[in-house]
Design a protein with these regions (language model features):
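Conserved radical SAM core fold
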Residues: 9-11, 55-57, 88-93, 105-126, ...
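Conserved alpha-helical substructure of the radical SAM core
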Residues: 1-97, 102-105
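Structural recognition of alpha->loop->beta junctions
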Residues: 96-109, 170-181
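Generic alpha-helical secondary structure signal
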Residues: 26-30, 60-63, 93-97, 117, ...
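Radical SAM enzyme [4Fe-4S]-AdoMet core and its adjacent flexible, acidic
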Residues: 119-200
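Hydrophobic faces of well-ordered beta-strands that scaffold small-molecule active sites
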Residues: 46-48, 82-86, 107-109, 148-154, ...
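Long, contiguous hydrophobic alpha-helical segments, chiefly transmembrane helices and signal peptides
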Residues: 17, 50, 84-85, 111-113, ...
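Short, surface-exposed linear patches
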Residues: 69-74, 104-107, 128-132, 173-175
């Protein structure tokens, strides 16, 4: 896993992240690129999983390292795959295409159903669900030449039985096989406010 940043732009009550304003420095970026260049001949495969913090907050760092890997791949011929776990708020279609072009083809984005705006608010307190859905709908308009995979992770609280959320997602993405849904129970991952939530 690669953690280019620890800062987040959401304030989820179940979040275990430290919310520190720490971003990968340019020196560290160069060290990572040199390390990959020096080590890649020893391996046939390279996989990078971008995590955080919220990775889309440091788009340029990810593009820098990923572009280096793509350039290396044209010369040294190794298999390369990259994934990203993101809240999707900043992942508009323009950013998505940039990531796609440097080899990031798989994304996991968490949506908390109809409770999303309460459990996954922006740091400023504003709603986030509508913007994420809009981003995903626009990404879905990309032609079939864009072969990507987006996993929509649905975190559910104990007793959450409103299945209309799945009907809603189905109406948006069921015809696009590049989208899939992962259902997961919210657990005590160490968030400071998780005790106030109905979890199993």
């Amino acid at each position: 896993d690669a953690l280019p940043i620890l800062e987040l732009n959401f304030r989820c009550p179940y979040c275990y992240e430290p919310h520190e304003n720490i971003t990968m420095t340019s020196d560290i970026v160069e060290q990572i690129k040199k390390y990959i260049q020096n080590m890649i001949d020893k391996f046939d495969n390279l996989q990078i999983s971008w995590f955080g913090g919220e990775p889309t907050l440091c788009e340029n760092i990810i593009l820098d390292i990923s572009s280096c890997v793509k350039e290396l791949q044209t010369v040294r011929k190794f298999n390369y795959a990259a994934t990203m776990t993101t809240n999707g708020y900043l992942l508009n279609i323009e950013m998505f295409i940039k990531f796609y072009e440097v080899g990031i083809r798989s994304f996991q984005i968490t949506l908390d159903g109809w409770n999303h705006n309460e459990t996954r608010p922006h740091i400023s307190g504003i709603r986030t669900l509508e913007r994420i859905i809009d981003n995903l709908r626009k990404i879905s308009t990309l032609s079939s030449e864009y072969e990507y995979n987006i996993i929509i992770r649905h975190n559910i609280l104990d007793g959450d039985q409103d299945f209309s959320w799945y009907d809603y997602l189905s109406s948006l993405f069921a015809k696009d096989k590049r989208f899939s849904i992962l259902v997961a129970l919210v657990s005590d991952w160490g968030g400071t406010l998780v005790g106030s939530m109905p979890i199993s």
